[in-house]
């Protein structure tokens, strides 16, 4: 039996009584954002909208984007990345679980020195794929040209964000490259690996 999204009490500033809001709404108010699904236009627009609102509300407070995503639509992922670069506050990225494909691209887009992977997280990079399988030959050629432009854009961003040379990123993107948290740190996708709490 599905439980749905849990609700928690929250008192709005200036209000006497608390209201019940879903847990994600409560966390957004604390500047904690979540990408816990495949990247598509809907989730990209939601994240961008929240970032823009938080940016206009207070430009001095950082945002924290938790990533556990198998990837998804290239343009939707690039739009989230662009929004992260546009907002004034630093956007910390935290990888938990898996950040693959556009998920790893968004993870790498966090403020440099503020990108973290949890100890058992996995990161995967590869080249963008075309979703165009059926159509006129001319349309396929235009699609292939667009995919090559997107691949070039993504390669340049990864090189800039990781400090790795373009040729190495391009070579690695030819196949699925899976990285442990430590390997992702060595590669430059994240800056730190979180330490496990050993006091338990």
UniProtKB/Swiss-Prot annotation:
The active site is at residues 101, 126. PROSITE patterns: CLP_PROTEASE_HIS, CLP_PROTEASE_SER. The keyword Chloroplast applies. GO terms for cellular component: chloroplast stroma; endopeptidase Clp complex. Pfam families: CLP_protease. It is found in: Plastid, Chloroplast stroma. GO terms for molecular function: ATP-dependent peptidase activity; ATPase binding; serine-type endopeptidase activity. Its EC number is 3.4.21.92. InterPro entries: ClpP, ClpP/crotonase-like_dom_sf, ClpP/TepA, ClpP_His_AS, ClpP_Ser_AS. It comes from the Eukaryota. GO terms for biological process: protein quality control for misfolded or incompletely synthesized proteins. Keywords: Chloroplast, Hydrolase, Plastid, Protease, Serine protease. It catalyses: Hydrolysis of proteins to small peptides in the presence of ATP and magnesium. alpha-casein is the usual test substrate. In the absence of ATP, only oligopeptides shorter than five residues are hydrolyzed (such as succinyl-Leu-Tyr-|-NHMec, and Leu-Tyr-Leu-|-Tyr-Trp, in which cleavage of the -Tyr-|-Leu- and -Tyr-|-Trp bonds also occurs). CDD domains: S14_ClpP_2. Belongs to the peptidase S14 family. Cleaves peptides in various proteins in a process that requires ATP hydrolysis. Has a chymotrypsin-like activity. Plays a major role in the degradation of misfolded proteins. Component of the chloroplastic Clp protease core complex. This is ATP-dependent Clp protease proteolytic subunit. It comes from Adiantum capillus-veneris. The lineage of its organism: Eukaryota, Viridiplantae, Streptophyta, Embryophyta, Tracheophyta.
